[in-house]
């Protein structure tokens, strides 16, 4: 009877272990075999406090990026901007294409072109840094552009306030403030400065609590 009990325990353990052994996180990696038509077909990636949306469109590599806690005066969560990367020679003009999100290791791998150029994109989990690593059999020139749509104050329409704390009842003249963007040698610097008065102050005033 004791031997039968041990055999039963072993069989149960095997039944529990075998299904787990057959499952690998890499089996669920999203894989695309064609470039995207726009940002609505982007692939998420991130690490630590950094988040990205990555895609290839019309022969260019793009990604939006954001960081935890980047709220503006209206309590809207703002992306930092968009980065555009152009490669010469361009591997996206011909040959095969494959974009894969490596779930287990937390990075995106793009393989493109007749020579199977490899591009790896990931975020450092310990520092707010985004890495783009380009590998190929030939010398490749890389042109990187930073793009921002907050180059001036932008008046918000009523429906556009659903992304901030005003929702469907924004005050008249509400706007998203512009960023400060500058260039130092071969570097680009930018920041967003919130006004002294925020959505909290306006809410207190509206509710007569000031």
Predicted segments, located by residue:
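Short, Lys/Arg-enriched N-terminal segments with co-localized hydrophobic residues
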Residues: 1-2
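Sec-dependent N-terminal signal peptides
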Residues: 7-20
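Aromatic-residue-lined binding/catalytic grooves and analogous aromatic/hydrophobic interfacial grooves
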Residues: 23-210
